[in-house]
Amino acid sequence: MTAAALRRTPLHQLQKEAGARFVDFHGWDLPVQFSSIIKEHQAVRNACGLFDVSHMGQVWVTGKDALPFVQKVNSNDAARLKPGQAMYSHMLNERGGIVDDVIVSCFGPERWFIVVNASTREGDVAWLRRNAAGFDCLVDDQSDAMGMVALQGPAAKEVIGAVSPGAPALGRFGALELQLWGESCIVTRTGYTGEDGF
């Protein structure tokens, strides 16, 4: 795919100005490094690093049957989540095979937020919409309207606390809706680095 045909996140220009080296990741022009991979790895292990993960899918499921629907399509028990909690789960097909691994956040019995992987986003959203037939709920793909970053590392709690005083109080797999700089944001205490993060 040519560089002109690659999709770009809302942070692309800032990353370019910061000297990022970009790679094609499933049709997205994403930064693979800024200074050195080793320095950036050490930053995440010893302090913190910020990852642009806007390429991942961001899907709201809302409506009267949102909980029964989310319960149907996930391997873990969504009914055990209270508002403000999230879980790692798998979406399963009718044979029990894995469609994708996801993070599911509960913001009330009628409001759920699901983060799906970039490489399977379009298929995941289509699959969710097909499976929503018969449920009184809306599957709303907000992926192109939202950016997403991951702040990861032992100092992540301190750094996020400087801009969002409520976020550090979240427990592991906690979820919070808030306003930052006049914008609606979702903060979850999750990540894939093995370090603490948001």
Q: What feature does the model see in each segment?
A:
Residues 1-198:
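Basic, glycine/lysine-rich polyanion-binding surfaces/domains
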